[in-house]
């Protein structure tokens, strides 16, 4: 008899359709059956001995909320008997796209420990959100949960996962107490997504995901020298291929709409073979050999809100002479999606796990380091720069100066002119604190008050959902925004011969430290921001609330 091993995850919802992801214990037919008669079925596909399905749900009524159940080979497996949570539901937007849209986002989540053990990093923001929604099912809830990277930590496993690794293969050989292959990756997803609160939350709130480094390894693709060192190890290839395969199965597949899934040749090939392990492994090999041949970035439209989720890890160009955050094809895709039919959206959200605008000292140090690494101060400084880059995680947009300038230019273009949206908002995580920063253009197109774009442009950074915030991070990032730090940063930039960035910016909110989520409420051309921190089981405290469209 087929059982439900993981899920369900409600991944996509539009006015008339949805997708629901599950893992079953054996091959079977998965069915989603809605209370209003809508539904769908899908046969499981197999990867490395595991059985998955992404069920397309059709026939939904726009602007409604309907409960659903999951059946495997005709037997109901969700909701579980005696569940303490309300029924899982699919909530569809109205056909005209005129509804208010709420988008919650954050990044960096260690799996919460079992309920009977102490949580050393404090309450989990997703657990707290789930508890609040479960306590009042009629309360306002996000229309989408945007998870901006580090959904799992392949290089920082829990004690429980480490014990399983020790029992399976020992810890003597590299990568030791880190994930080695696809099977061990599945343990991370079980640990994270079987958390009862998170499991229910992901079953009833649609989610969008993108990887960051820890989904594979810390500093993933930080430089060409780093990659060469990793490829020289005996364990890296299996780790990377397994990371990409498990990401495709658990996260990427659900990012796609039913129409995109129907046109996806890899998805068709995976479903057409009794065991898709080799098919998916060949895909991961191609992604490793030629990253430009694969696109992990994607677009989601929520009525008149456009979300572009950008891959800032696998799409990099690492050659020091032409270093870029995005390869040419990826950059062209981002530009096309941002500028296409601009009059059809009121808000443009750019999801990039790595922040565009950083504290000024951090930005200048990253630009200086990039100059050293490309040899601007000679070979000795280049070697020092590479060591520093890895030790200090100097790999955000500022560490790719040409890409920083190109993104800045694209944001200005997308936000200017008669068809400009009300806002262009860059959503990021990674840095284990939250802040709001606003750029200021020295001139250029648009009729904005500062000579920049007509749209309100902001960097919104929110991290972590559930992770540690060492004192050094708190002190360092507070200092990084100060006038003294800005002056110090200019000294570094001068030493590297760095050009001034094309915009200046100032911090307008934060820094805030804690396990937290930001939520955008977007309606017509108005936008409001709320930052909430987890303060206890089921408690999210509002620490900031502001109107983003009034200047």
Where are the predicted features?
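Metal-dependent phosphoester/phosphodiester hydrolase catalytic core
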Residues: 1-551
């Amino acid at each position: 008899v087929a059982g439900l091993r993981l899920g369900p995850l409600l991944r996509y919802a539009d006015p008339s359709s949805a997708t629901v992801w599950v893992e079953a214990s054996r091959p079977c037919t998965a069915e989603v059956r809605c209370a209003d008669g809508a539904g769908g079925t899908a046969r499981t596909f197999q990867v490395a001995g595991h059985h998955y399905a992404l069920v397309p749900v059709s026939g939904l009524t726009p602007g409604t909320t309907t409960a659903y159940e999951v059946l495997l080979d005709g037997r109901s497996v969700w909701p579980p008997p005696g569940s303490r949570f309300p029924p899982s539901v699919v909530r569809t937007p109205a056909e005209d796209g005129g509804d208010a849209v709420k988008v919650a986002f954050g990044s960096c989540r260690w799996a919460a420990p079992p309920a009977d053990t102490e949580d050393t990093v404090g309450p989990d923001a997703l657990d707290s959100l789930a508890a609040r929604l479960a306590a009042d099912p009629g309360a306002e809830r996000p229309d989408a949960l945007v998870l901006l990277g580090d959904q799992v930590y392949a290089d920082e496993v829990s004690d429980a996962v480490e014990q399983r690794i020790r029992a399976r293969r020992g810890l003597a050989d590299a990568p030791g107490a880190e994930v080695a292959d696809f099977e061990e990756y599945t343990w991370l997803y079980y640990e994270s997504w079987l958390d009862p609160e998170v499991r229910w939350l992901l079953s009833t709130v649609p989610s969008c995901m993108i990887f960051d480094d820890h989904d594979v390894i810390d500093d993933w693709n930080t430089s060409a020298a780093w990659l060469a060192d990793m490829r020289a190890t005996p364990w890296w290839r299996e780790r990377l291929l397994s990371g990409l395969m498990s990401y495709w199965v658990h996260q990427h597949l659900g990012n796609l709409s039913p129409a995109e899934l129907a046109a996806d040749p890899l998805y068709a090939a995976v479903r057409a073979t009794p065991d898709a392990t080799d098919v998916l492994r060949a895909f991961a090999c191609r992604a490793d050999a030629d990253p430009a041949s694969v696109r992990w970035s994607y677009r989601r439209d929520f009525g008149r809100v456009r979300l572009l989720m950008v891959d800032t890890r696998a799409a990099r160009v690492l050659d020091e002479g032409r270093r870029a955050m995005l390869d040419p094809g990826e950059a062209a895709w981002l530009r096309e999606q941002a500028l296409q039919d601009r009059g059809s959206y009121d808000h443009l959200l750019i999801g990039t796990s790595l922040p565009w605008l950083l504290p000024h000292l951090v930005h200048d140090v990253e630009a200086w380091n990039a100059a050293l690494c490309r040899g601007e101060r000679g070979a000795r400084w280049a070697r020092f720069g590479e060591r520093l880059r890895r030790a200090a995680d100097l790999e955000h947009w500022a560490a790719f100066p040409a890409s920083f300038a190109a993104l800045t230019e694209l944001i200005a273009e997308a936000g200017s002119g008669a068809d400009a949206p009300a806002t262009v908002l860059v959503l990021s995580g990674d840095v284990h604190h939250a802040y709001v920063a606003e750029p200021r253009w020295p001139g250029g197109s648009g009729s904005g008050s500062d000579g920049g774009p007509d749209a309100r442009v902001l960097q919104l950074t929110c991290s972590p959902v559930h992770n540690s915030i060492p004192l050094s991070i708190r002190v360092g990032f507070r200092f990084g925004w100060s006038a003294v730090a800005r002056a110090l940063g200019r000294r570094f930039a001068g030493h590297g011969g760095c050009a001034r960035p094309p915009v200046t910016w100032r911090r307008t909110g934060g820094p805030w430290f804690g396990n937290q989520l930001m939520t955008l409420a977007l309606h017509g051309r108005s936008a409001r921001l709320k930052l909430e921190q987890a303060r206890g089981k089921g408690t999210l405290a509002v620490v900031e609330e502001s109107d983003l469209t009034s200047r």
